[in-house]
Regions:
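Catalytic-pocket segment enriched in acidic/His residues
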Residues: 73-196
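Active-site microenvironments in enzyme catalytic cores
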Residues: 1-123
Length: 196
């Protein structure tokens, strides 16, 4: 399984573009918490978790905390056509957040954290990977500022910062898998996987 050449080149370009890639991920009712099941689409064949740092932003656009996010993605749908990205990213149980919000951490501290993911299937580890939050190119406040341009969030927003760890192209999640994402300064977010 692979993404189209156009999709791959479009993603490469965004890292050096003046404007960051920001798009709408989820309504609150599409997200789940710790130990609740995340979903894989029944009409997709290549589904992966995307472990991400999540910024908790108040209604004024200021970052007030951090948590762990899992941006579930149907890579075959996304790779077929970039215009299908909303279908690949936003569906029931396509996002998990938790286990809690860490308040008061400055950017230098947050950038020192590591992020990792493990996936188990029938109690056997089938994937693990990790990276450092310091690999995020843009400043966290720049991302928040772009999100709040020309729009308001009366109750604030959660902004997931993108992933640096994804399983190999020959891997897909299966119903019954368990995904655990760890961020060193926050803790662990664990979710079983179901088909939706």
């Amino acid at each position: 399984m692979e993404e189209s050449d156009f999709s791959a080149s479009a993603y490469d370009q965004v890292y050096d573009a003046p404007r960051p890639e920001i798009f709408f991920k989820s309504l609150p009712e599409k997200a789940v918490g710790p130990h609740e099941a995340v979903g894989i689409r029944k009409d997709a064949h290549w589904n992966v978790p995307e472990p991400e740092l999540a910024l908790i932003i108040n209604a004024q656009g200021s970052i007030v905390g951090h948590t762990i996010g899992n941006d579930m993605s149907s890579r075959d749908i996304e790779g077929e056509n970039l215009l299908y990205l909303p279908q690949a990213k936003m569906y029931d149980r396509s996002c998990s957040l938790g286990p809690w919000i860490v308040l008061g951490s400055d950017d230098a501290t947050v950038r020192s954290w590591s992020i990792g993911v493990t996936i188990t299937r029938s109690e056997e580890m089938v994937f693990s990977g990790d990276t450092s939050i310091s690999q995020i190119k843009r400043s966290f406040q720049e991302l928040a500022d772009y999100l709040f341009r020309s729009q308001r969030f009366a109750h604030g927003a959660v902004l997931m910062t993108g992933t640096g760890v994804v399983p190999n192209d020959d891997f897909t999640l299966e119903q019954g898998d368990v995904v655990t994402i760890d961020i060193s300064g926050i803790g662990s977010l664990t979710n079983p996987v179901i088909r939706v």
